[in-house]
Structures are given as C-alpha cells and as structure tokens.
C-alpha cells in the first residue's frame, strides 16, 4: 500500500515537478506585458535623455567630411599647363597690341599710357614707337617657381574654405540640436505636465 501510494503520489505531482509546468507557462506571458507596460512618459523621458547625451560633435564625427574625396583637385602638372596657356595668351595679346600700334601710328593720347605700362618706359635715345612690347624681357620667376607659388596659394585657399565650412556646419548642427531638445521638452511638458505624478511615471 505504501508503495502504491508513493507511486500514485509521484504521478499526481509529476506535472508540478516537470520544468515545463502549465502554471509556469501561464505566468510567463504576464511578465512580458508587465515589462512592456511602462509609462509612455518614462519612455519619452529616456529618449530625451539619450538625445540630450548626444552632441553635434557626435553627428559631425559620424558624417564623413565632404572634402575627403575631392576629385577636381588640381595637380602640379595641371597647374603648370594652365600657367603655360595663360602665358601664351598674354604673349598673343601683347603681339596683337603691338601690331595694332604699328598699323595705326596716329593713336590717341589716352591709349599711350596703356602701351607705356605694357612695354615699359622708353630709353632716352629711342622713341616710344621703337620700344616694342615684343622686346626680350627678363623673367622674375621660372615656370616651376610660378607653379609652386600657385600651388601654395591654392592650398592656403583650400584650407581657409575648409575651416569656414567646418565652422558653419558646427553652427548649423548646434542650432538643430538646440531646436530638437526644445521640441522634445515641449512635447513632454505638453503631454504629461498636467497629469498627477504616480509610481509608474
């Protein structure tokens, strides 16, 4: 009898001792809604706190700089080529002005200072007509030196533009960040400001 009662007792309590008990299955769904049934005010406050913890510098670090992959940057060869082309255009312009002055010797007096500036002052023994702009001039810089000067000027200009861009971007990000924080605070106060405080919130 004792053995029979013992066996019967174990069979009766078998569902309770099993890991997959029906009572545990009934209680399991209740814990999930309880954790998910938090107050919307707490969720909104947590979102506002996480947003307040961020800063415009964080978004600036996440976004890659638009100056990183600039494909239109001039190389040294392109700078030298542009200088050569500009020098050729200047020579052609001077040649045309010299031929125009030779073809029309009776030019007006107002065009003479312009020719004087281009060709330079005439020597005491020669007249202004004989001092041609095509005269051999001694250059102050070589082509390589001019290219280096232009490259340095372009680099300085690029750095200045980059600094101005970063400053403007930081200012705009700070303004957007302040507007977002103010909007979130206004929404929280409008939705939950007049409600009485409870243990849930």
Swiss-Prot record:
Polyubiquitinated. Polyubiquitination is dependent of UBR5 that extends pre-ubiquitinated AKIRIN2. A motif (Nuclear localization signal) lies at residues 23-28. A motif (SYVS motif) lies at residues 198-201. One of its GO terms (molecular function) is enzyme binding. The keyword Repressor applies. InterPro entries: Akirin. Disruption phenotype: Mice are embryonic lethal. Null mutant embryos could not be detected even on embryonic day 9.5. Conditional deletion in macrophages impairs proinflammatory cytokine production in response to Listeria infection and clearance of infecting bacteria. Conditional deletion in B-cells causes a decrease in the splenic B-cell numbers, leading to severe proliferation and activation defects in B-cells. The B-cell viability is also impaired, leading to decreased immune responses to T-dependent and T-independent antigens. Keywords: Adaptive immunity, Cytoplasm, Developmental protein, Immunity, Innate immunity, Membrane, Nucleus, Phosphoprotein, Protein transport, Repressor, Transcription, Transcription regulation, Transport, Ubl conjugation. Molecular adapter that acts as a bridge between a variety of multiprotein complexes, and which is involved in embryonic development, immunity, myogenesis and brain development. Plays a key role in nuclear protein degradation by promoting import of proteasomes into the nucleus: directly binds to fully assembled 20S proteasomes at one end and to nuclear import receptor IPO9 at the other end, bridging them together and mediating the import of pre-assembled proteasome complexes through the nuclear pore. Homodimer. Interacts with IPO9; the interaction is direct. Associates with 20S and 26S proteasomes. Interacts with SMARCD1; promoting SWI/SNF complex recruitment. Interacts with NFKBIZ. Interacts with YWHAB. 'Akiraka ni suru' means 'making things clear' in Japanese. The name is given based on the presence of the clear nuclear localization signal. This is Akirin-2. It comes from Mus musculus (Mouse).
